[in-house]
Amino acid sequence: MAERDMEQRRWERLITWLRDRGMQADGLKVERRPRSDGGYGLFARDACAPNEILFSIPATAMLNIKTLRPLYASWAQKLSATQLISLHLCRHRPVADGESSDPAFGPYISTLPRDFDFHPLTWLVEDGGHPYKILLNHLPPAVFRDLKDLEMRFSSDWAVCQEHLRDVKRTESDYLWAWLNVNTRCMHYRVKSSASDPDNLALCPVMDFANHRPEGPHMQPRPTKQFPARADMSFVAPGANIGAGEELYFSYGPHCNRKLFVEYGFALRGASGEVDVDDLVEGTIQQREDGKLSQELLENEGYWGDYTIHSSPEPNISFRLLAAMRLLSLPTSQPPTSPNEAVSAARHPLGFEQWQQTLYGSRDRLSAEIEEQCKISVLQLVEHIKARAKDALAALDHLDWNGPAHVMDMVKVLWEEERDVADTLLNFNLPLW
């Protein structure tokens, strides 16, 4: 109860600070409340009409390169948005249960999560044997691969920023806390002339208490102007009536659980069903006698990697996976002896040129025999995925785990998604192409 009272006081101080920044906070239609799962969410205080403006956040209350660069010397101009916002949070991280001493954004920083023990990047980066580290050995291969990629992004930013943190004696652990706040809570906010510039992001008070769910209804952001920067940001109710006390959600996008887990640190049953099968397909290719050649041919055509299977919106395999499986279904004597031979049409082996035509859109299918072999190979792949997922889930059931049940459940959801996507494809009449 004491912790919730403290969080409520922080919420009240945040609203007072926002009011001082120009926010119209009288009769505020939303508030942060505890959820039944132990976390927090954003809830409607009163009934809301469809598309009604719920709240507006002044541009000066958001953390982005426009609001932070004036607080630092010229070296800050060279930092990316992620690096600069993370650096500022790191410098002003609250100590223990205390409040942030930042004179510019302290009341907001004090409302941010105090730790990210639940996030897999913490398990990977923290020294001293994090208690959840054992779960890293039980992640799907594609999830662990993407997590290592995230670690590289973090390490790169830490290498740039650490020299600007020595005066306040901040550690890599402090920067990890700050960086994960940025990576998990920032929203798109236009500050650059190019709409696709990676620096178009900001931490936005109040909005960042809203949880994600894959399907609507959702709140929607409405900037007061598209550009130039420094636009206030309004948030409108979903296009349906919202009752008093209902939770308000925000959408991070139609992500599969691999993305949600690696980037945001959670997984949801019912997320967009997708399984990355790069490790299985690439492993199969590399074990073949003609594996090096097959890899080169796929690379030359731009079809190496990013192989996926899906259960929604309809069960299917990606065209990239289909291209690879068709190539592997050609008789081993058909591909040219080197990629250079493909330059000469006269030396194209039987079936290889037709395979290329399926990539360019001038041909829909290969011969019935090759398509049948492709179907068999896809079925074997999907069966392998299902069996691997079942084995992984059984191993998790027998793991000596003393941590929180919801953390273990996240990892199980990843494997359940792989199993269920495979099941869905097997229950359909392949081929689906």
Language-model-detected regions and their locations in the chain:
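Eukaryotic helix-linker segments that join adjacent hydrophobic helices
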Residues: 66-121
